[in-house]
From Swiss-Prot:
Encoding gene per record: ASB15
Keyword Ribosomal protein: no
Name of the molecule in the record: Ankyrin repeat and SOCS box protein 15
Entry keyword Repeat: yes
Record Pfam families: Ank (PF00023), Ank_2 (PF12796), SOCS_box (PF07525)
Primary role: May be a substrate-recognition component of a SCF-like ECS (Elongin-Cullin-SOCS-box protein) E3 ubiquitin-protein ligase complex which mediates the ubiquitination and subsequent proteasomal degradation of target proteins.
PROSITE patterns given in the database record: ANK_REP_REGION, ANK_REPEAT, SOCS
Domain SOCS box intervals: 524-579
Family assignment from sequence similarity: Belongs to the ankyrin SOCS box (ASB) family.
UniProt entry keywords in alphabetical sequence: ANK repeat, Repeat, Ubl conjugation pathway
Free-text comment about domains: The SOCS box domain mediates the interaction with the Elongin BC complex, an adapter module in different E3 ubiquitin-protein ligase complexes.
Length: 588
């Protein structure tokens, strides 16, 4: 047989010719612009009305006016577009036969062709009619969607089958190289997946992000489709462009059956993506409890350590308390720190899982972590400062009850003589007293270089190394409290704040700068009266007892209960009369 008579080659040549014709039509087709709209003829209006009402005899009369078929309304719809979205097949046939073939590919102003409109409308017979008449099956709408993709979105096996029988391109990419196989995997249509594969579908085809249909099925939790694709040769160990494995995608979807299936067929929980995240991190962040139960035993400690963060961090970041509890039950350390390269990617250089919970204002996760032994003092920016600035009284209470350093400084931007927390609580007496009741060094707010109201100079006290490790006193002395609170935009607060502070002191060394600012405040008469009179012996004893006990014992209720003191005295020592937040909640 002569090579020129090869039927396969003839078929390919015919296909190439058809594709060339289609490209010519695409290049030369009329684009409809609403601003070019001209009034429709009476014949066009009557023709469209006949289509919409299903009057075949009237339609046959009006299609004789060819110009009426070539007129579009303000939406860019020609009579053919109207015909494809109505259910009577004979009407479509009449309009299609009467229309010029160039109109078969014309798009509406929304970018839809007659075929994509028919598919979207779910009219299988209309789709078949268009295809049998020779409408090109591969023209995309302006969103980049092919008729095949739209048919799969509708879940119509019959439409997909009809399109495949008329030489639709199965692997034709849409936006971001998303293919029919990917869409079928996303929608979970096992029958359509089987049909596509039987017609030459590629199980290894990757989208614009390097994800295979297997990865898509795993992400969307379609276990039956996933298993079918695996049996058809899908690669369980395939990686996307960002390094994400199929198991990583399944962890994001959260279907435990998909994860179990992938593990059964050789999937590994120890393969990180390019960011270093493992499937266990993804499941913990997304809050997929059952998926996490599968992943914990198959993920190695070495892989987690190498990643630079723990699933505890991920669960706290994702605000997933149940997953957090599961991880703690399985022995994960709540005080594990982020690796330096990850920590440095955050502006605040956070380290702990607790910091994530506090930043998220997540009271439940904060409580779980603290109950499990989380140390609130491990981050460069102390968790307490974050909670105070966020005005979250409950998290501040929890942190202080579990040993947060109320006298901490933000070590990276430390330019105050006084501990940092108070500067975020000046507008909130409840928060201010919460800090003061728990041992804030209020005397530090009255140390400055201005001298007292009698003209005497103050002496700078030395800062203990354990309080401010690695910092010299010259850094701390830059900005005393009196300078801080008397700036023009905060000067109005000086009276109310100083009135609260003196409740926690024995001797008040008021400097000349503070005095001049206080004299114009409405609280000044009361403050002056307190300054002119000695403190009560009871109050002085309270302050002495607190100094002897130390912050650790004061802030832990269990230790306080061990003291052989009457409850009334215990409450007095703890400044319970000033515990405004506790009074709001009726706390003991």
């Amino acid at each position: 047989m002569d090579a020129n008579d090869d039927p396969d080659e003839d078929h390919l040549t015919s296909y190439d010719v058809q594709l060339s014709i289609q490209e010519s039509i695409e290049a030369g087709k009329t684009v409809f612009y609403p601003e070019r709209f001209v009034p429709l003829s009476d014949q066009n209006r009557k023709l469209v009305e006949a289509i919409q009402q299903g009057h075949i005899l009237e339609l046959q009369e009006y299609v004789k006016y060819k110009y009426a078929l070539d007129e579009a309304d303000e939406k860019g719809w020609f009579p053919l577009h109207e015909a494809v979205v109505q259910p009577i097949q004979q009407i479509l046939e009449v309009v299609l036969d009467a229309s010029y073939k160039t109109l078969w590919e014309f798009k509406t102003s929304d970018g839809e062709t007659p075929l994509t409109l028919a598919v979207k409308a779910g009219l299988v017979e209309n789709v078949r009619t268009l295809l049998e008449k020779g409408v090109w099956p591969n023209t995309k709408n302006d969103k980049g969607e092919t008729p095949l993709l739209l048919a799969i979105k509708r879940g119509s096996y019959d439409m997909v089958s009809a399109l495949l029988k008329h030489n639709t391109s199965l692997d034709q990419p849409c936006v971001k190289r998303w293919s029919a196989m990917h869409e079928a995997a996303k929608q979970g249509h096992k029958d359509i997946i089987a049909l596509l594969l039987n017609n030459g579908g590629n199980v290894h085809l990757k989208d614009g992000f390097g994800v295979t249909p297997l990865g898509v099925a795993a992400e969307y939790g379609h276990c039956d489709v996933l298993e079918h694709l695996i049996h058809k040769g899908g690669d369980v160990l395939a990686l996307a462009d960002d390094g994400a494995s199929v198991l990583f995608e399944a962890a994001g979807g959260g279907n435990p059956d998909c994860i179990s299936l992938l593990l059964e067929y050789g999937g590994s929980g120890n393969i990180p993506n390019r960011a270093g995240h493992l499937p266990i991190h993804r499941a913990a962040y997304e809050g997929h409890y059952l998926a996490l139960k599968y992943l914990i035993p198959v993920t190695s400690k070495h892989a987690i350590q190498k990643s630079g963060l723990t699933p505890i961090h991920s669960a706290a970041d994702g605000q997933n308390a149940q997953c957090l509890e599961l991880l703690i039950e399985n022995g994960f350390d709540v005080n594990s720190l982020l690796a330096d390269h990850i920590s440095e990617s955050y502006d605040d250089e956070r380290k702990t899982a607790l910091y994530f919970a506090v930043c998220n204002n997540d009271i439940l996760c904060t409580e779980i972590l603290l109950a499990a032994g989380a140390d609130p003092n491990l981050d460069p920016l102390n968790c307490l400062l974050v909670a105070v600035r966020a005005n979250n009284h409950e998290i501040v209470r929890l942190l202080l009850a579990h040993g947060a350093n109320v006298n901490c400084y933000f070590m990276h931007v430390n330019d105050t003589r006084f501990p940092s927390a108070i500067q975020y609580a000046l507008n909130d007496e409840v928060m201010l007293r919460l800090l003061l009741n728990n041992g804030y060094q209020v005397e530090m707010c009255f140390e400055c270089m201005h001298g007292d109201i009698f003209g005497n100079s103050f002496v700078w006290s030395e800062i203990e190394e354990e309080v401010l490790p690695g910092w010299t006193s010259c850094v701390i002395k830059d900005n005393p409290f009196c300078e801080f609170i008397t700036v023009p935009w905060m000067k109005h607060l000086v009276g109310s704040v100083i009135r609260v502070l003196i409740d926690y002191m024995d001797y008040i060394p008021l400097c000349a700068k503070l005095k001049s600012a206080l004299e114009v405040q409405r609280e000044w008469p009361e403050i002056r009266q307190i300054l002119e009179n000695p403190c009560s012996l009871k109050h002085l004893c309270r302050l002495k007892i607190r100094r002897l006990m130390g912050l650790q014992r004061l802030c832990q209720p269990t230790l306080m209960e061990k003291l052989s003191l009457p409850p009334t005295i215990q409450r007095y020592i703890l400044f319970k009369e000033y515990d405004l937040y506790g009074q709001e909640l009726n706390l003991p």
